[in-house]
């Protein structure tokens, strides 16, 4: 079945001028280019999650067909593919084809990344700082969520932009490890700095980053009121303070939780939550 679906997916990609076909399957598919189209597979953790979700039953749904249709067409599969493309650095302005072949679901879908939540978030945040900064911090956050440090899960936060106002509303908890270093070695868009960021993510507090990507501080404690924030229940102090600082300044915050989620805040609102376990 997968071979047939993949063939149809490639033909469809040609028709809609897509440069990529994303395969969601428990089976192995070699990453390759075919007729100029990149073919690659999503992590098996997602196809397993898709199957597990599809086997759920309850009065809320009128059978498996409605559940699967809602799941694929309206939320997870399309958003997942768009987010995966973003993390891989693939910017698709045209439609993207997804080929799904699992124990419970088989089909081909067309995804419009430009209408996805991740792209809407990128576009909205890019009004305030370089999109490269946003992409770099999200990729670092994904690494922190996946790897932690020395086998230990970590949580941390990044506050980006409006540095002067953010510094006024925060204090240094420990000696700032980035103070006095040249800007070049503090630029978060340079992969050579990421190891240092991973190391200092163990510090309490958050990173402060300017709109060009220069890391101004690590281990910074945000001092703002968190009352009247309209956020989901159960969030910890780091999430609340990082959300609140975006309400009082023009900054944007990205928070990595110890549970592995990545949250983005702007103007006191939560723009997106990314579950990193399926990437």
Kindly label every feature range from the protein language model.
Residues 2-249, 253-279:
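Divalent-cation
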